[in-house]
Amino acid sequence: AILRGFAPSFYQGEIQGEVLVYGKPIGEYGGELATKIGYVFQNPFTQISGVKETVFEEVAYGLENFGVPVEEIVERVEAIMKLTHIDSLAEKNPLELSGGQMQRVALASVLVLEPDILIIDEPTSQLDPQGTESVFEIIKMMKDKKKTIILVEHKIDLIAEYADEVLVLKGGKLIASGDKAQILSDMALMEQGVQLPQMAILGS
């Protein structure tokens, strides 16, 4: 649903409501919207191109497609790989990495494009606690850089720690929205099957 909403000309079917980017409905944008929004898939394996032999080349792939000069590509890729702590993996094959490493490569491949908006779909669903921590360190860095981040996540502890605004969906419908403190202290949501943080339950 998130992807369909941001690509209305690609996915067919009935779509209700609207999404505005810079005050303009996304349906009125052309291909230039692709330069403003970065999408990180739930499964990093589906994001890896499969045509590049090294992590460095994989991270550079999007910039090559946008026609960025080689010197700038090298500079931006080196910087983002250092930021995401994958510089030591530069010469490794992306398809031979661990799940956590591959997810960081997928993130770096999007971040190097410098999008204004990041859509991240359950980035830790297949990761162990260490991999989860490393990925959310990167998300926090992007948040500190004032990037707009739309995070699809089911783990309530991560939502409690990193979110500012929370939207709760059930059966494809929005059932609650508001600031984090308001949503995570709403006991009525438990009747909808939403698991609230233990501290919120104890304090009720």
Which positions does each model-derived feature cover?
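Conserved catalytic motifs of ABC-family nucleotide-binding domains
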Residues: 114
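Conserved ABC ATPase signature
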Residues: 93-97, 101
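Conserved ABC ATPase "signature" region
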Residues: 71-89
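Catalytic Walker B motif of ABC-type/P-loop ATPase nucleotide-binding domains
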Residues: 118-121
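Conserved beta-strand-loop-alpha-helix hinge in the C-terminal portion
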Residues: 173-196
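H-loop/switch region of ABC-family ATPase nucleotide-binding domains
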Residues: 153-154
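ABC ATPase NBD Q-loop/coupling interface
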Residues: 18-32
